[in-house]
Amino acid sequence: MSEMSLIMLAAGNSTRFNTKVKKQFLRLGNDPLWLYATKNLSSFYPFKKIVVTSSNITYMKKFTKNYEFIEGGDTRAESLKKALELIDSEFVMVSDVARVLVSKNLFDRLIENLDKADCITPALKVADTTLFDNEALQREKIKLIQTPQISKTKLLKKALDQNLEFTDDSTAIAAMGGKIWFVEGEENARKLTFKEDLKKLDLPTPSFEIFTGNGFDVHEFGENRPLLLAGVQIHPTMGLKAHSDGDVLAHSLTDAILGAAGLGDIGELYPDTDMKFKNANSMELLKQAYDKVREIGFELINIDICVMAQSPKLKDFKQAMQSNIAHTLDLDEFRINVKATTTEKLGFIGRKEGMAVLSSVNLKYFDWTRL
């Protein structure tokens, strides 16, 4: 059995997919798509090493200790070149994680022809009439190239060292005069590029798990600036001490959302040692944090918030706070509840030295079946 490693390309921006979630993080059952696709291929062969390119290494490492991860580049070729630095096996298989349902039959066809050329690649024939600039092309000469592809590692590295932009391995190797061998591709190996493609693939649907997160934050009164809660001005001068604008509710809610998704906390994302967050709009930071959560495949179910303050009274502001949260997070207002309570004059809150907020949220996997 030939020594071979596997590279899975999962660092793309999913621009053409055109949803809030990056396609590599769509959930298939409980697995993100990148993991589902990698598990599928790794079940067919005892790869020497499996390398996954990523734009979110810390989060992806939570799913497995069996793979190596490397930060992707700005292009496919750059990502592949970086991943190849970790590969020393004679052969390397490269695939896009967006080709989720590669079959064992296709995999075996690639392996069986390993000694035929420098790069073995699956390809589909074109059945439909094909036009270019309104001129009919000879469809018999057209091939739709797919992945996974198997290449001789040294030759692929050399091909990419040309620093030219190639969209797949076979064209890079062919540009150097290398020999390409085509095997029959398959419809199931078509790339998931547009959200409409989901309807063409028989994929497991997301599981119905719910993820709960809590966030707690405290700030001291003392700044002669507006007191903001959920971006709503509560008092013109009773501001809270903070590196940002001091919106303690926004901070608590941000932590709750990050926690439910497993993305750390607000201090990691927006450190108070970074001057670019000085006096920052905390509701805008909340929105950015939720955008990151949505990118990795989650969406909010509901929010419940308890504001603890002896003063000022908040009854007349709760509706405005709920509305502003709904607008910021693109969430139905009926899914948001803001409560206010005192501590009956006990403790630092009762002494009017500061205020605290406890936020709880529930997340679920993004339901891509609605697309």
From Swiss-Prot:
> Which residues are noted in the entry as 4-CDP-2-C-methyl-D-erythritol 2-phosphate-binding?
217-219, 243-244, 265-267, 270-274, 309-315, 341-344, 348, 351
- State the needed cofactors, names only: a divalent metal cation
Q: Which UniProt keywords apply?
A: Isoprene biosynthesis, Lyase, Metal-binding, Multifunctional enzyme, Nucleotidyltransferase, Transferase
| Superkingdom | Bacteria
Positions MEP for the nucleophilic attack, annotated site positions:
R139, K191
Q: Give an example GO biological process.
A: terpenoid biosynthetic process
Q: Does Nucleotidyltransferase show up as a keyword for this record? A: yes
Q: Where is this region: 2-C-methyl-D-erythritol 2,4-cyclodiphosphate synthase?
A: 211-371
Ranges for region 2-C-methyl-D-erythritol 4-phosphate cytidylyltransferase:
1-210
UniProt GO molecular function: 2-C-methyl-D-erythritol 2,4-cyclodiphosphate synthase activity; 2-C-methyl-D-erythritol 4-phosphate cytidylyltransferase activity; metal ion binding
What's the Enzyme Commission number for this chain?
2.7.7.60, 4.6.1.12
**What reaction gets catalysed by this protein?**
2-C-methyl-D-erythritol 4-phosphate + CTP + H(+) = 4-CDP-2-C-methyl-D-erythritol + diphosphate; 4-CDP-2-C-methyl-D-erythritol 2-phosphate = 2-C-methyl-D-erythritol 2,4-cyclic diphosphate + CMP
> What is its pathway?
Isoprenoid biosynthesis; isopentenyl diphosphate biosynthesis via DXP pathway; isopentenyl diphosphate from 1-deoxy-D-xylulose 5-phosphate: step 2/6; Isoprenoid biosynthesis; isopentenyl diphosphate biosynthesis via DXP pathway; isopentenyl diphosphate from 1-deoxy-D-xylulose 5-phosphate: step 4/6
- UniProt keyword annotation of Glycosyltransferase present: no
Task: Indicate the annotated site residue(s) for Transition state stabilizer.
Answer: R16, K23, H243, T342
Task: Please give the PANTHER family that the UniProt record associates with this protein.
Answer: 2-C-METHYL-D-ERYTHRITOL 2,4-CYCLODIPHOSPHATE SYNTHASE, CHLOROPLASTIC (PTHR43181:SF1)
Q: Which HAMAP family match?
A: IspDF (MF_01520), IspF (MF_00107)
Family membership, please give it.
In the N-terminal section; belongs to the IspD/TarI cytidylyltransferase family. IspD subfamily.
**Function per UniProt:** Bifunctional enzyme that catalyzes the formation of 4-diphosphocytidyl-2-C-methyl-D-erythritol from CTP and 2-C-methyl-D-erythritol 4-phosphate (MEP) (IspD), and catalyzes the conversion of 4-diphosphocytidyl-2-C-methyl-D-erythritol 2-phosphate (CDP-ME2P) to 2-C-methyl-D-erythritol 2,4-cyclodiphosphate (ME-CPP) with a corresponding release of cytidine 5-monophosphate (CMP) (IspF).
Q: Which NCBIfam families match?
A: ispD, ispF, PRK09382.1
Q: What is this protein called?
A: Bifunctional enzyme IspD/IspF
Q: What is the lineage of its organism?
A: Bacteria, Pseudomonadati, Campylobacterota, Epsilonproteobacteria, Campylobacterales
